[in-house]
From Swiss-Prot:
InterPro entries: KH_dom-like_a/b, RbfA, RbfA_dom_sf, Ribosome-bd_factorA_CS. It comes from the Bacteria. It comes from Rickettsia rickettsii (strain Sheila Smith). Keywords: Cytoplasm, Ribosome biogenesis. GO terms for molecular function: ribosomal small subunit binding. The keyword Cytoplasm applies. The keyword Cytoplasm applies. One of several proteins that assist in the late maturation steps of the functional core of the 30S ribosomal subunit. Associates with free 30S ribosomal subunits (but not with 30S subunits that are part of 70S ribosomes or polysomes). Required for efficient processing of 16S rRNA. May interact with the 5'-terminal helix region of 16S rRNA. It is found in: Cytoplasm. This is Ribosome-binding factor A. GO terms for biological process: maturation of SSU-rRNA. Belongs to the RbfA family.
Length: 120
């Protein structure tokens, strides 16, 4: 009988963890980044690596910034090659995964649910 839940392999979880740590280090140092990200504190909420290990979906949440989500996405995408090169040096694999950034809507959804529950 097949499992209904999707589980991630040990390799996926390990690679996601390494990428998460590398992204945190890059954001903390501020090197190799688009200048718009210097005054834009970001939290990497999760990293999900595909089963073939070729794509890393990185979810972020900005705090206290004047930039819009689109501007942050543009700045992250402009820095993508430098970020990928940094990650490539951290992992010892034949191929480095393609990094894709996504805004994490989880916090917004939690606020909406809290407001709905409050209104009950």
């Amino acid at each position: 009988m097949k499992k209904l839940t999707k589980t991630h392999s040990h390799r996926q979880q390990k690679l996601a963890s390494i990428i998460n740590e590398a992204l945190i280090e890059i954001l903390r140092r501020g090197k190799m980044l688009d200048s718009r990200l210097f005054d834009c504190p970001l939290t990497i909420t999760k990293v999900i690596v595909t089963t073939d290990l070729k794509i890393a979906n990185c979810y972020f949440l900005p705090f206290n910034t004047k930039l819009t989500i689109d501007e942050i996405m543009d700045a992250l995408n402009n820095s993508k090659n430098a970020i990928r090169n940094f990650i490539t040096n951290k992992i010892h694999m034949k191929f480095s995964p393609d990094i894709r950034f996504h805004y994490d809507h989880g916090f917004d959804n939690a606020i909406k649910v809290a407001h709905l529950l409050k209104d009950l």
